[in-house]
């Protein structure tokens, strides 16, 4: 196998890792504690502020912050696809990869 064919094969396998990770869209990295401790000002020394997409929420009580943060920044059960399909499933793209390797690269 020539060096060029090996390099093309490595690029294909590395790019397939990214495609494989796209199929796992339901796994979203959320911090274990979405509320971080900070100093709010002179009146309230200890605050817990929410890390979220929708708005910043701060509370002197950590439990209130956790409850409100999870309520507002809830992750939907079914991720929105905006009308776009997930694409080809893993068995199909592996089939096409095999065909590509066989016919184009001649391996």
UniProtKB/Swiss-Prot annotation:
The chain crosses the membrane at residues 87-107. Keywords: Disulfide bond, Membrane, Signal, Transmembrane, Transmembrane helix. Expressed in flowers. The keyword Transport does not apply. It is found in: Membrane. GO terms for cellular component: membrane. It is a single-pass membrane protein. Residues 1-22 form the signal peptide. Disulfide bonds join 35-49, 40-69, 47-65, 50-58. The keyword Cell division does not apply. Belongs to the MEG family. This is EMBRYO SURROUNDING FACTOR 1-like protein 5. It comes from Arabidopsis thaliana (Mouse-ear cress). The lineage of its organism: Eukaryota, Viridiplantae, Streptophyta, Embryophyta, Tracheophyta. The gene is ESFL5.
């Amino acid at each position: 196998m020539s060096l060029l064919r090996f390099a093309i094969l490595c690029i294909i396998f590395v790019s397939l890792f990214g495609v494989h990770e796209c199929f796992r869209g339901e796994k979203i990295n959320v911090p274990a504690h979405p509320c971080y401790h900070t100093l709010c000002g002179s009146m309230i020394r200890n605050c817990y502020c929410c890390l979220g997409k929708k708005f910043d929420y701060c509370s002197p009580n950590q439990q209130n912050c956790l409850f409100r943060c999870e309520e507002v920044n809830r992750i939907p059960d079914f991720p929105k696809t905006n009308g776009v399909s997930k694409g080809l499933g893993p068995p199909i793209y592996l089939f096409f990869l095999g065909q590509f390797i066989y016919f184009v690269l001649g391996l």
